[in-house]
């Protein structure tokens, strides 16, 4: 048994796909094929059967956890004799570039919003808290974009702490994958949702991962339930290259795209560049910063070929 398997056995309850699907019980499928088409990411072939087998049981688990948290809050408030501000239940979704975090987040948002106990579910991505391009260039971090140091961590933590404190309206910067930068003077406003889903590469990071300040709070300190979307690196690199090739004929073809110069590449040239980007940036970031946080997650979704989930690990 490998050390990783030993850790998994010690910390997690493993479920094969069929076992996990049985935990759905009577939760209804509230998404149509058209709904799912709007939620799919680039290069993902997720089906309604995947939603039924994997995401419906997960939405049931999260609904139970949200209810338990709400009941604990009511008991504490009765004891203290106070009416506190509304505080959302916070779910984080972490994982590598190209693993499908955004699709997982969108599907969970859609499913959880159909539960009557928590109809208002908001979703943000940490991309908006990347330093602006000009600042990344000034700091010499353009080849480290996505690494922890490329983020405005203070701004991100201030944002999520304000959410957790129950502030009525909190703003987050908006990021454009076309311009590869923050959108100037545009913000996403979060107004006391029942649930907030926050998706990003490093949302499971803690103080012990920081070379700068081990004592300051991190996103993970404010999260109620954390999910890590996992896959073998060989698959991740393959998916990244496939996605890059699709972007080349899609988003990259727009004149305003930061990567417009890639749109004229041949398949062979584009594959070579995507592979180099993975090997020099995304792969090292996965190995050094993202994957080491995996075992902090409450739940790990393990993907195999074609983005299909083949195992779920639930923390004991």
Curated annotation (Swiss-Prot):
Binding site for ATP: 95-102
Protein EC: 2.7.1.33
Pathway membership, UniProt: Cofactor biosynthesis; coenzyme A biosynthesis; CoA from (R)-pantothenate: step 1/5
InterPro entries: P-loop_NTPase (IPR027417), PanK (IPR004566), PRK/URK (IPR006083)
Main EC class the enzyme belongs to: transferase
GO terms, molecular function: ATP binding; pantothenate kinase activity
Catalytic activity: (R)-pantothenate + ATP = (R)-4'-phosphopantothenate + ADP + H(+)
Cited SUPFAM superfamilies: P-loop containing nucleoside triphosphate hydrolases
Localisation per UniProt entry: Cytoplasm
GO cellular component terms, A-Z: cytoplasm
Annotated GO biological process: coenzyme A biosynthetic process
Major site of localization recorded for this protein: cytoplasm
Keyword Phosphoprotein: no
Gene3D superfamilies, alphabetized: P-loop containing nucleotide triphosphate hydrolases (3.40.50.300)
Pfam families assigned: PRK (PF00485)
Membership in a protein family: Belongs to the prokaryotic pantothenate kinase family.
Entry-linked NCBIfam families: panK_bact (TIGR00554)
Identification of the protein by name: Pantothenate kinase
Annotated organism of origin: Shewanella piezotolerans (strain WP3 / JCM 13877)
